[in-house]
Amino acid sequence: MIEERGSSRGSREDRGSSRGSSRGSFEDKGSSHDWKGMGGSTPRPRLTRLVAKKDRNYDAKVDSDFDDDSSVHSTSSPRLSPASSDNLSKITIGQQSFRVGGDVDNLKALYEALGATSPAALGIEASDWESRRKSAVYSRPTSPPRVSHDTGQSSYSHDFQFPASRVDSSLESPPLSPRGLAPMSPVRPIEVEWRKHRNNYAKPTISNRPGRENNPLKPSQPPPTMFPQSSGLRTPDPLPPIDTSTSRLGRESLELQNRHTTLGAYSPPGLRKVHSELTGLVSARSDGAGWASDIESAKRNEDLAVASPVFRDNLPSAAVAMPNGSLVRASFTPRDSNRMNSVRSNSHGLRWNSCHAQEAEAIAKTALEETSNGLRIEDPERIRDLEKPSPLIIEKVDEPLSEVSSSVSTESSPSVIPKRPPWDTWAKGEFLGSGTFGSVYEGVARNGTFFAVKEVNLADEGKLGRQAVKQLEREIALLSDIQHPNIVQYLGTERTEDKLYIFLELLNKGSLANLYRKYGLFYEQIKAYTEQILTGLKYLHDRKIIHRDIKCANILVDTNGVVKLADFGMAKQVEKFGFAKSFVGSAHWMAPEVVDPKQQYNFAADIWSLGCTVLEMATEGPPFGELEFIAVFWKIGRGEAPLIPDDLEDELKDFIAQCLQVDASKRPTCDMLLAHPFITGEEMTGPVTQMGTPGLSTISEERSVDMSVTSSIAVSSNSGTSPRVIENLVNHLSIERRPKSMRTLRSELSMSSAESIAS
């Protein structure tokens, strides 16, 4: 029980009369429960109530009534006269209302003696204890105490002393007062923790000077934001920001400050050895002395100087870029138990003092000089930028693509110097699609330009990797010299150690395949798109370039309805004779001469693919779409063109039929097709071109079909069977023009008579 030594901080002579207003002192022996025990003829008001109401709005009419004794903890005597309610004073502090009795000045003096700056500190309810224990800012006396090193007691003015608080903040709920009416409030922390607080946060040494230093009228320093807890010290005020200016230790290193050092304040004897191990990409190490290093990837979208799993103390550390693109944070700090329970610290953390600056600077200078030979220090601004999601930044290189890696490409190929894009940095965005050798993403440059990015992985080994490198070199070489409104514009190329990025013009509406699947195509659309495709194809043929992969999926559309040829990975610039032999392309759109490995082909192969593309737009599906690719090869190899529906317009059917002639020499050129009535809109004067099924003798001299006794079909380039036998075999077969599947085809082949095969 805390005893009031006088109702005011007056002289010591009136203590006897003022003791009557206390709650049961030893001299009074219970006389405080009677008005006669006040020590004078005129009864002095005493403390009747001390209540912390939870209502935010104080109502004078309602709260001044004394009939609500059940809702408050009252220390008044039951003999209290209702007339004494006139002596009550209402004090509203902040958002809580208090009802007290007696002289206001005396109560304020009592609050000050108890170490509380407001009555709210004495009226905390048990239900609010847990939240207040964790988040409330405790009050301290207005004047600093004089601390006795012998007894650990704090003394205030007028020789008022009180023992250390009996409240343990680790308890789940506060202990009740002796009368069992209200919980006791934590007046202040225990003296040991208070002294520890002064040691760590306020002053380096304890102030114990008498005189005016402890005058209660003299203003003292403001209290800290948080008092020490039983489990340890809480986080102090934020440290001053780190100076990121260039230091004398290196152009890209952090400058050492008085309280923030790059390396620890102390260095073990094996410091140089540790740095040499870090240079060799040794994994994170932690020995008995408490020295550790942390290797983190530069791709983490966090502040590496703060979010390290080992060092969470907002202290800078050396961030070194390793050859593999990672960052090494080397911060050597001895374990210190004083920071064990800091909010963002652990056993490796240490609070730095100004006296360690010179020693740490010398240690860090030596360590950084040893690591600067093979490593470079990461820019601190770059480290802080990693807290936000950072875009993919690609460094520019001018080396030929064939020099990317000797293990990727072993074949000789012409060196291609990539063209630089018109921007410095860019970010990879939404995924748009994928192809044979890479994926396509949407990209945006720093200046706001949007484009398409073709990403290819150069780290793939084997035949596929070598083929990808050759294809990319060919595509870059062709696109660098192409500039046409109906061809996707090439913007530039960049690469890293294992990635190649090709920047192309972005067309937001996607390909023709996506367009007809989503909306369908009108006759006028097919006509307009075909004319634009022919214009771009003529531009390529005039420059001796065969596209070899014309189909709706490789033709893109912009918002204005302009179509452009794309995906030049299969394209090839032929010699002066204009022939090629490579077996490349998409099966459903390949010409018969391309399927035959012994035949050469020229620009007429693109005309066949164009006819299949126009048929695809008209029927909203690829040619031979119901067949598997091996069946498609068989049908095209035997000289069969896809069927043209009869419900199409005559001009459109004639245009497709002329493009799909099996004899490549009879196919028209791009100039001839641009003058076709389907393109010009003129009426047709002649009959529609009929598509007949040619005999196999036209291609039997260059290839053969091996029809084994099994139900499988094998297409071979070896002359293992007589052309005459194959011709008789095919002529006697009764096969529909468009079988539904390979199973249907096999069943019809098995129904053929053995006599016809023997003949």
UniProtKB/Swiss-Prot annotation:
Keywords: ATP-binding, Cell membrane, Kinase, Membrane, Nucleotide-binding, Plant defense, Serine/threonine-protein kinase, Transferase. It catalyses: L-seryl-[protein] + ATP = O-phospho-L-seryl-[protein] + ADP + H(+); L-threonyl-[protein] + ATP = O-phospho-L-threonyl-[protein] + ADP + H(+). Its main location: membrane. It comes from the Eukaryota. CDD domains: STKc_MEKK1_plant (cd06632). Residues 72-85 have a biased composition (Low complexity). It holds the Pfam family Pkinase. The gene is MEKK1a. InterPro entries: Kinase-like_dom_sf, MAP_kinase_kinase_kinase, Prot_kinase_dom, Protein_kinase_ATP_BS, Ser-Thr/Tyr_kinase_cat_dom, Ser/Thr_kinase_AS. One of its GO terms (molecular function) is MAP kinase kinase kinase activity. This is Mitogen-activated protein kinase kinase kinase 1a. Induction: Up-regulated in response to chitosan. The active site is at D549 (proton acceptor). Its EC number is 2.7.11.25. Residues 426-679 form the Protein kinase domain. GO terms for biological process: defense response; MAPK cascade; response to chitin. It is found in: Cell membrane. Residues 1-17, 25-36, 52-64 have a biased composition (Basic and acidic residues). Residues 1-90, 122-160, 165-184, 195-239 are annotated as: Disordered. Belongs to the protein kinase superfamily. STE Ser/Thr protein kinase family. MAP kinase kinase kinase subfamily. The CERK1, MEKK1a/b, MKK1a/b/c and MPK4a/b proteins are involved in pathogen defense. The pathway induces rapid growth inhibition, cell wall depositions and accumulation of defense-related transcripts. This protein is required for responses to chitin and acts redundantly with MEKK1b. ATP binds at L432, G433, S434, G435, T436, F437, G438, S439, V440, K454. GO terms for cellular component: cytoplasm; plasma membrane.
